[in-house]
């Protein structure tokens, strides 16, 4: 795709100098709209309980699931609340899942056992054969048995189940369904190729020289300073860059300094300070050439809970002068030349990975699209703001490109909805470990990785 454009009859790197002055004209975003206002926090009150967000989530998603249930099981299916169940009656029940997990970390358990047992080692996954699913609605809860995938499903997902209540007070499930994809706006018809470059996990301050080499090559590519004239012409078609979180390394968190006496750390400087200065210089180079959207991540200097608010412009005294630099929320939703992008920095996908049997980030990304919610495990195992009027993480519009950052590897696939929705799923890998970025063609919705790992020091030593 992107590479094919550069393979033509144009001059290469080893051609004689030309008297014709080469030009680098960047394509512009004629149509751009930041649609992330729903993730901006105005009043911040943390005195409310988290029960409100589960109640409003169920209230908002119930009509969607009733529609999906009737499409799947027929219009004559009886939809009951848990308090209306009658023994043996086959019906449909809609509720929020709670997954009872023996291995799930609990601060209360840690406090009660800290004097008697050694701390449990960190696990990649917390699922076990003893896990149970419980369905809750506004008033009651009931244990689920039967045709449910206990290992795959997670707490917080809202779904419809078909079955009957047994005498023992358990609901035997025959089938279950998730919500259908929301309405999608039609794709625009672009006359030329335009690209959006996505990368994540720059990991600044981590001390890896290889990743900095790859990062500089990435900057040279985006700004049109790498390759021959034809390559630069292709780079000029990159209309926007999205940095999907974790711009700083986990090593910059400086948690060790919290345990030191003040007189030992008074004259030391946090590792994140130099990393932010480096980020400012990178954004200065990039935003001077192309529009850049910067999303925060788990290791970046902003609030920890979702939705993460934009990084403050005061941290970037050089690059903040450019109007092309846009500091955005996580999650982030925008419309670029008529193509709707929606994505996160990866915390939601990584959290589901721990509490589900799903192994592939791309499968988890597709599952969140099917369940109609960006982060169903919030607020149980993933921190989020205690919303009470509405749940902003419910999918209101079907995106054309749905991505997550900080993934272990690059992967993409296209899924099609029941009403013809076409969605490109994309996992953006950590740049600091893979030296890989992603290019999305807005005209065709095709995606390809661009790797800079072949330029690392390890490869040179290996030769």
Curated annotation (Swiss-Prot):
Pfam families: DNA_pol_D_N, DNA_pol_E_B
Lineage top rank: taxon: Eukaryota
GO molecular function, one term: DNA binding
Keyword DNA damage belongs to the record: yes
Gene Ontology cellular-component annotations: delta DNA polymerase complex
Record's subcellular location: Nucleus
InterPro entries: DNA_pol_a/d/e_bsu (IPR007185), DNA_pol_D_N (IPR040663), DNA_pol_delta/II_ssu (IPR024826), PolD2_C (IPR041863)
GO biological process: DNA repair; DNA strand elongation involved in DNA replication
Location, primary (coarse class): nucleus
CDD domains assigned: MPP_PolD2_C
Keywords: DNA damage, DNA excision, DNA repair, DNA replication, Nucleus
Cleavable signal peptide: none
Described function: As a component of the trimeric and tetrameric DNA polymerase delta complexes (Pol-delta3 and Pol-delta4, respectively), plays a role in high fidelity genome replication, including in lagging strand synthesis, and repair. Pol-delta3 and Pol-delta4 are characterized by the absence or the presence of POLD4. They exhibit differences in catalytic activity. Most notably, Pol-delta3 shows higher proofreading activity than Pol-delta4.
Family statement drawn from the similarity comment of this UniProt entry: Belongs to the DNA polymerase delta/II small subunit family.
Self-association and partners: Component of the tetrameric DNA polymerase delta complex (Pol-delta4), which consists of POLD1/p125, POLD2/p50, POLD3/p66/p68 and POLD4/p12, with POLD1 bearing DNA polymerase and 3' to 5' proofreading exonuclease activities. Following stress caused by DNA damaging agents or by replication stress, POLD4 is degraded and Pol-delta4 is converted into a trimeric form of the complex (Pol-delta3), which consists of POLD1, POLD2 and POLD3. Pol-delta3 is the major form occurring at S phase replication sites, as well as DNA damage sites.
Name used for this protein in its record: DNA polymerase delta subunit 2
